[in-house]
């Protein structure tokens, strides 16, 4: 089964970008609480 590199990149961006938007405020609040 051949892996389409563009589809892999699109999927990685589609997963990582919303995760970053959720993770960045969480890390900021976690660091400020200490």
UniProtKB/Swiss-Prot annotation:
Gene Ontology biological process terms, A to Z: photosynthesis, light reaction
Record membrane topology: Single-pass membrane protein
Annotated keywords: Chloroplast, Membrane, Photosynthesis, Photosystem II, Plastid, Reaction center, Thylakoid, Transmembrane, Transmembrane helix
Predominant location category: plastid
GO cellular component: chloroplast thylakoid membrane; photosystem II
Subcellular location: Plastid, Chloroplast thylakoid membrane
Transmembrane segments: 5-25
Function of the protein: One of the components of the core complex of photosystem II (PSII). PSII is a light-driven water:plastoquinone oxidoreductase that uses light energy to abstract electrons from H(2)O, generating O(2) and a proton gradient subsequently used for ATP formation. It consists of a core antenna complex that captures photons, and an electron transfer chain that converts photonic excitation into a charge separation. This subunit is found at the monomer-monomer interface.
NCBIfam families in UniProt: PS_II_psbM (TIGR03038)
Family assignment from sequence similarity: Belongs to the PsbM family.
PANTHER family named among the record's database cross-references: PHOTOSYSTEM II REACTION CENTER PROTEIN M
Binding partners and assembly: PSII is composed of 1 copy each of membrane proteins PsbA, PsbB, PsbC, PsbD, PsbE, PsbF, PsbH, PsbI, PsbJ, PsbK, PsbL, PsbM, PsbT, PsbX, PsbY, PsbZ, Psb30/Ycf12, at least 3 peripheral proteins of the oxygen-evolving complex and a large number of cofactors. It forms dimeric complexes.
Full protein name: Photosystem II reaction center protein M
Originating organism: Psilotum nudum (Whisk fern)
Phylogenetic placement of the source organism: Eukaryota, Viridiplantae, Streptophyta, Embryophyta, Tracheophyta
Gene name tied to this protein: psbM
């Amino acid at each position: 089964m051949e892996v389409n590199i563009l589809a892999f990149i699109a999927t990685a961006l589609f997963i990582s970008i919303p995760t970053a938007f959720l993770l960045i405020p969480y890390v900021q609040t976690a660091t400020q609480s200490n």
